[in-house]
Structures are given as C-alpha cells and as structure tokens.
A protein has these predicted regions:
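Noncatalytic alpha-helical scaffold of FAD-dependent oxidoreductases
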Residues: 1-454
Length: 454
C-alpha cells in the first residue's frame, strides 16, 4: 500500500488514503477483506469532480487498466462488448470506431472507465434519445465485501443490478461488464449549429414541441454572464452520426484522437475571472452562425473537445473549481429561468455552462437523469459568496422537484439527497443486503450520509 494524496477532477478537497493497485481479482479480495473502520472504495481515472473516489484515512483500490476482470472483446456481429471495469472509454473507442461501433453513451470526456460509467450511470447529449449508460449494460460481475463475485443483470438479481447502476461504487467493486454498442458508418458527426438570442429561444428550440426529438444528440451552451434581453442566450448544437456518404472520401472510419495542447504547469487563480470569461463568452457566441448551419465534425471535436487539452482542470489555479449540475422537471421552466438569472445577477463567471433536455428515468434508484432540464456549469471554487448562492439555488431546485448529480457534487447538504432521490431508502436496503459489513465507503458517502438510515 502507498499513502497518496487524492482529489476529484475539480481539485478542491484533497485527502490522503492508502492506495493499492491490484494485480488480479484475488488481490482485490485481499484488500477488501482487510478494510478497516474507514472502509474501501474503488477509483478509476479520477474524473468525478468531487470526492466520490476518495476515502480519507481508508483504502482506495486504484482500478484503471485491464489487470482485473475478463479481457476486452467486441463481437462485431452483435455489437456486444465485454470489458474489464478499469478499461477506459478511450481505449474502447480506439478499437471499436474503426470497426463500425460507437459507445451507446459518452459524457464530455472519454477518459472514464467502464466501471465508473456504470457507478455514475453517465449520460450524454443523447439521453432524450438513448437514455443513460446503465440502460445498455447487459450484465456485470461485481465483487461484494464478502469476497464473493456475483453476476448482475436486469434479469438476474435485478434489484442489486439497478442499485449498482448509479450507486457510486458503494455496493461493490465492478470487475467487468457486457454492454451493447451503437453501429456507425463513419467516425464523423453531422452537426447543426445555430445561435439563439435569449433564454426563451433556447428553451423553445429544445422543447418537445420543437424538432429536438429528431436529433440523436442535442446540447446548448449557455452564456451565464449575459443579462437583460440576452440573459440565457446560447449556441445550440445538434447532430447524428454521419453516413459514409456524408463523411466524404478516404477511410471514413479512421479514428485517432489527439491531445493537441497542454495546460501550463502553473496558472494564477484569477486567470479565469469575470472579465476574461465575459470576453470569451462574447467571442464564442459571435462566432456561432446566426442561422442554422450544417457541417461535419470528428467524433473528438463533437463529443470530447476538452480532452484535446491535457490537464485543463488546472486552469482555475490552485483554488480548484466546482462543477454544479442539477435537473428540474420539464414543467419547471420558470425555475430554470430564475436559476440562470440568479447566477447572471451575481456575476458568477462560467465559460462552461450547458443545458440539455433529458428523457425518462431508468429503474436505478440513485441514477441522476430523469425527464427534465439539466444545467451544468463550472465555477472557480473561490468566488466570493458562492456557497450562499448555491444554497439558494439548491432550495429552488429541490422545491421544484429536482435533484443534483452526485458524481459531480462537492457542495449539497445530506437532506438534498433524501429530497431529490425519493427511492433512496430502496437503494439503501439493497446496498445493505450487498454489504452488511458496510465495508464500502468514500468521502462523498460520509459527507452526505449515504450509508445512514433516517
């Protein structure tokens, strides 16, 4: 074991844990069997923004890689992948795209593990069309705290399966999984882009009575600095996988994503401030086409633009940053408007603020997505008055029947989980069945009381 200082991707709450890189399943079993009072948690590539994969004073299983679990395979006749939990979506895509298959769901980064994708039940720009990652998982093998390995699927142990999907690693260690891929003709995306002048225009374009449902992928960047008539203005981007004909000549399935640049080794805390972000937002909005424009983009450019900047999470300096994501029902558009007005009115600067319309929820009691509007934004952790502002927004979200995404959370109070996730008690019962010794634990779980009844 090695003592290691860890944080989430937001680089805010650093804690020290004993870390182990297991060589095989037996070593995972040994570590779990020796977990002390502080417990153990699995960690993949560390892309959760908060403390979901940290365990101060306890143990952390460092799981990225392919040493643990069944080896990777892709059946090109069915599109079914078998992958070790520590394998990244990046590695899956590098093999699958040239063979005509794409992951069913991807978040804004491909540097997440298969196990992390399930534990966080990741979603993407296509939730209104394809749901979240867990809905495409056919089966997974999970090691319980007893050391036993169980196979879970929607048909076999469905209660435990859905408790693990979105369960934040607190039901067991996912060893490997089978999931169904999406067939594609090319490594390109047909993209339609247009800028919209204000909040009402953005919501109208993305509403169910518009044409949003005809696009597999849909997302709008929102300018959180703009006020007045421009409040909530955005750049709407929608698309689908390009056909071979649309992709043009050459090898239409060629796929080799690159890291183009690296963040500087040191960044002052005030580099991303209200003035610099306001200038960036103005340029970003103005460069978007005033009328709907159709173009062809690569998979990395459309899905994972920030992956092209190595270490982009350091750009907020040593203070780190918070990524805040919530969802409210589709009927609560006015609450969404008031939230955006609150951020704009207080001058909270965010260059990365995105709005998506989500589809129906799945059966996982702790899965974040449900039918509604979800807004995600990055903010420097040191902004004056930010905790008080977020507390006000939390109340607005919860009173509207909304909730927060735990994979990104570093802020909400324990009560927010009970209010936002009405099936929390159901999840806790399944979790206790799987881990009666309560060996699995994390800094996130302790802060939010996720293992506590009442």
């Amino acid at each position: 074991m090695t003592k290691q200082r860890l944080s989430g991707w937001g680089r805010t709450a650093w804690t020290v844990a004993d870390t182990v890189v297991p060589a095989d399943e037996n070593e995972v079993r040994t570590v779990v069997g020796s977990a002390g009072d502080r417990g153990v948690i699995a960690r993949g590539l560390g892309r959760s923004y908060g403390a979901a994969a940290q365990n101060a004073g306890g143990q952390v299983l460092m799981m990225p890689g392919t040493a643990v679990g069944r080896p990777y395979s892709l059946d090109t006749s069915t599109g079914i992948v078998t992958a070790p939990a520590g394998m990244s979506l990046d590695d899956v895509l590098r093999d699958s795209v040239p063979r005509g298959w794409f992951v069913p769901v991807t978040p804004g980064t491909r540097f997440v593990t298969v196990g992390g994708a399930i534990a966080s039940d990741i979603h993407g720009k296509n939730h209104h069309f394809d749901g979240s990652f867990g809905q495409h998982v056919l089966a997974m093998r999970v090691m319980l705290s007893s050391g036993d390995v169980v196979t879970l699927s929607p048909q076999e142990n469905p209660g435990w399966f859905w408790a693990t999907v979105g369960g934040m690693g607190l039901t067991g260690v996912i060893l490997d999984a089978e999931f169904r891929m999406l067939p594609v003709e090319s490594s390109r995306v047909r993209v339609e882009t247009e800028r919209l002048s204000g909040f009402d225009a953005v919501v109208a374009a993305m509403s169910t009575d518009g044409d949003d449902a005809s696009y597999r992928y849909s997302v709008s960047w929102v300018d959180l600095v703009a006020t007045g008539k421009s409040m909530g203005r955005g750049v709407l981007t929608r698309g689908d996988h390009a056909t071979a004909a649309e992709a043009g000549g050459g090898d239409v399935l060629a796929y080799d994503p690159k890291v183009r640049v690296a963040a500087p080794p040191w960044v002052p805390n005030q580099l991303l401030n209200k003035l610099s972000i306001k200038a960036f937002n103005e340029l970003w909005f103005r460069k978007a086409p005033a009328r709907r424009h159709v173009g062809i983009e690569s998979i990395p450019a459309f899905f994972h633009p920030l992956d092209g900047v190595r270490g982009w999470n350091t750009l907020y300096g040593t203070q780190g940053f918070i990524q805040y994501q919530f969802i409210v029902p589709l009927s609560q558009v006015e609450v969404l408007r008031k939230v955006i007005e609150a951020f704009a009115g207080q001058g909270v600067a965010s260059f990365l603020a995105v709005l998506k319309r989500m589809g129906p929820a799945n059966e996982a009691p702790m899965s974040f997505p449900t039918e509604g509007w979800t807004l995600t934004l990055d903010m420097a952790a040191g902004i004056k008055g930010l905790p008080e502002l977020l507390a006000r927004v939390d109340t607005m979200v919860l009173d509207a029947g909304g909730r927060h995404y735990l994979a990104k959370d570093s802020h909400v109070a324990p009560l927010a989980v009970r209010r936002g996730y009405p099936q929390f008690g159901e999840w806790l019962r399944a979790r206790d069945e799987m881990d009666p010794a309560r060996a699995w634990n994390s800094d996130l779980a302790r802060r939010l009381g996720l293992l506590e009844r009442g």
